[in-house]
Structures are given as C-alpha cells and as structure tokens.
C-alpha cells in the first residue's frame, strides 16, 4: 500500500489481517497495520521497517516508491521486531545506507541483527537534526514509550511528527471504526504502565508545530489533532475519561453473575452515569483493562476459589496492577458457600495501587443472593454514585 502523506512523504506500510494475536496476547479482529514511511529529497530516508510477517509486501511498496533510487538513511525510531524485523534486509540490500538511531538503539541492535556497524551509523541525541535537502529531521528521545531506545522524529518543513508507537491503534488501515476505542485498548495494554514517560513526550511535542502525526500502527492523523492529544493527556495522567462505573465480574454457576446484573439494574435506576458490565471469563481481557481505565469507578464481583479468588479475577487485577491502575473509586462483592475469601484476596491488589478509594459497602453473598443482599447492593450503589 502506497499513500501520499505529501508530495515528498510516502506511506509504505502494510496491513496484517491474518494475525490471530498481536504480541501473542492481544486479539485483533480487524488486524493491525505496520507503518513505514519514506521521505524523498536530495537525501532519501526510510523511517522504520515492518514485521517479518509482511516483508515481501513491504519491500514491494518500498521499491515502488524508490523507483530505482537508493535510500541514504534508515531512521530507527523503535527496535521492537514488529517495526525493525527488516533492518538486516535493508542494510544488506543497500550497503551505503546509514542507520540513524540513538546510543541505546545501537547498544541493543546487535542483540537482534548481525550487521557490521562500522562507518554505517549516525548516532543522534536529543534535539539533533539531519538535513535531507528541503526537509530537516529533528530527533527527540522518548525512553520507555514503551521501550528504552524509543525516539520520535519531527520533520519541520511539512510539520510531521513520526511518533513511534505513540498514537497507535489496533486495526488495519481500511477498518472503518472509531479511533478512540481501539487506540485506548492499545494504549493501556501496550503503554499504560508508562504514563510518566508519555507525559514527558507530550511536553516535548507541545513545543513543536505539528500538523500531522504518523504513528507506527493505525491511521495517519491529519485533522483535529487536539482531540487525540487531549485523550493521550488524560490517559497518561491516569485520569478517568468517563465519569461512570465499570462492573467486572466472574461467576462459576451463575450466582455471582445474578448479583452483578442486579447491581447494574440498581445503578441504572439511581444514576444517569454511564454503566458498563463485563463477564471476565467470556470477554477480551485487554478490553476489560481498557474499560477499567476508562471509567471513574470499578466494581469487582467474584466467587471465592481454592482459598482465594476465582482465577480470572486474579488475572484481571494482576493486569491492572502492572499497568499502573490508580486514582479510581472501587467497590467489591464476593461470593462463598462456606468460607468467603474473595475480598480478602482482592483487597491487597488495591492496597498497592495509588489513589484508590475503596467503598466500605462490601457485599458478601452466601451461595445465592438474598433480599438482604439486595439491600446491601443498593447501599453499595449509593456509596459509588
């Protein structure tokens, strides 16, 4: 696929609609794109490569744009294999081409490739520039967004930010869907742990005059950039995007599910806030993580199991912990037929998170929901709305 970002800047990335799991863990029903770009000037540069799954298609796109010319530079914004797998191929194909990266790039690169880097590298630091002729590139370090060597590249003539994995999303480019949903799921599951680092990058970007954002996944952003930047600001500050409630439950024989659904109905009667609900056992974990971050309040409902909490809830809370979940209101419901212990197992996760306000209105169900439990659920609802 060749797309004109401008007369001089070309998109040469590829869609991957055959992949079942991105990073061997995230379902991508609409596939994913691996984005790569070329700037045609007195000096020609390629910005990042693509995953090895799509090498042949990418090489064809590249050769079509180059039209017999030779690239002078390969900009390595990110070394992760879905963007860097073809560095070796390109270095071998064009032996006079220079590799442009930062010190961490070239420290890590030999771990992936056997390339003689002698006289082949251009090592850049924060704010360094590379002149291509009419176009000038400037480089800004973005460590841990979401790898240590990541940098972004800014082209000043056409005011384009090549943002690495920042502003990326799941989904092939020809997918007709709202950007925010799959960008949010991508952000919190890929970059969510690194909000402080994303904030640092946003502050650098705020000093640049940006008219287009070219990420390594998802569409090129060309209009209403403040919308996308504002969402990234909210997400990376760990602030709720929506003043609402997300009920995450799991249930072995359906009794905890009945309690969760009852709470959902009670909340619908009591408040106009947005209410979302999900069965953790039968839904995408990455989407559940996304929704936990999206809403201001989280309710977890789970049965006791093997002296702890049902495994899928344990997995869910572990995901939230490692992604830096914070600054939310939380309420808990447990079920147990003889020794309820789910809350005791869930509580330590929240105790380790920052800015978590836990409702005192905890609910314990003994096998099946009673009239008293329904009163308790109403009290829980009152405590979180």
Locations of regions flagged by a protein language model:
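Short acidic active-site motifs
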Residues: 86, 284-288
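FMN-binding flavodoxin-like domain, especially the glycine-rich phosphate-binding loop
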Residues: 173-213, 217-220, 262-278, 288-385
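Short, charged N-terminal beta->alpha structural module
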Residues: 248-269
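Metal-dependent phosphodiesterase/nuclease catalytic metal-binding core
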Residues: 38, 152-214, 222-249
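Conserved beta-strand hairpin/beta-sheet module of binuclear metal-dependent hydrolase folds
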Residues: 2-63, 152-155, 159-163, 256
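Active-site metal-binding motif and surrounding structural segment of the metallo-beta-lactamase
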Residues: 42, 53-100
């Amino acid at each position: 696929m060749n797309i004109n970002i401008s007369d001089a800047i070309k998109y040469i990335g590829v869609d991957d609609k055959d992949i079942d799991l991105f990073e061997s863990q995230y379902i991508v029903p609409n596939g994913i794109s691996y984005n790569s770009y070329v700037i045609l000037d007195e000096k020609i540069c390629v910005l990042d490569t693509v995953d090895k799954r799509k090498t042949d298609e990418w090489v064809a796109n590249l050769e079509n744009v180059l039209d017999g010319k030779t690239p002078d530079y390969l900009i390595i914004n990110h070394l992760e294999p879905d963007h860097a797998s073809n560095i070796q191929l390109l270095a071998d194909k064009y032996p006079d081409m220079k590799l442009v990266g930062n010190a961490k790039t070239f420290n890590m690169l030999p771990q992936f490739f056997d390339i003689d880097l002698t006289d082949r590298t251009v090592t850049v630091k924060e704010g360094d520039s590379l002149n291509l002729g009419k176009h000038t590139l400037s480089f800004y370090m973005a460590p841990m967004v979401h790898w240590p060597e990541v940098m972004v590249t800014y082209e000043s003539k056409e005011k384009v930010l090549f943002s690495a994995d920042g502003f990326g999303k799941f989904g092939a480019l020809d997918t007709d869907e709202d950007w925010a949903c799959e960008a949010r799921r991508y952000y919190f599951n890929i970059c969510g742990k690194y909000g402080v680092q994303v904030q640092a990058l946003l502050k650098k970007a705020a000093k640049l005059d940006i008219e287009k954002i070219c990420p390594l996944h998802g569409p090129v952003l060309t209009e209403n950039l403040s919308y996308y930047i504002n969402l990234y600001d909210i997400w990376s500050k760990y602030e709720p995007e929506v003043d609402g409630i997300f009920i995450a439950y799991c249930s072995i024989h359906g009794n905890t599910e009945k309690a969760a659904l009852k709470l959902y109905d009670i909340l619908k009667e009591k408040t106009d806030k947005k209410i979302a609900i999900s069965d953790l056992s039968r839904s995408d974990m990455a989407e559940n993580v996304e929704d936990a971050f999206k809403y201001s309040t989280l309710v977890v409902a789970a049965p006791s199991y093997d002296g702890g909490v049902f495994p899928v809830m344990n997995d869910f809370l572990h995901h939230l912990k490692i992604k830096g979940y914070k600054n939310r209101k939380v309420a808990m419901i447990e079920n147990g037929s003889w020794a309820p212990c789910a809350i005791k197992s869930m509580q330590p996760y929240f105790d380790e998170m920052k800015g978590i306000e836990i409702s005192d209105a905890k609910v314990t169900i003994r096998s099946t929901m009673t009239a008293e439990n329904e009163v308790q659920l109403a009290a829980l609802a009152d405590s979180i709305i």
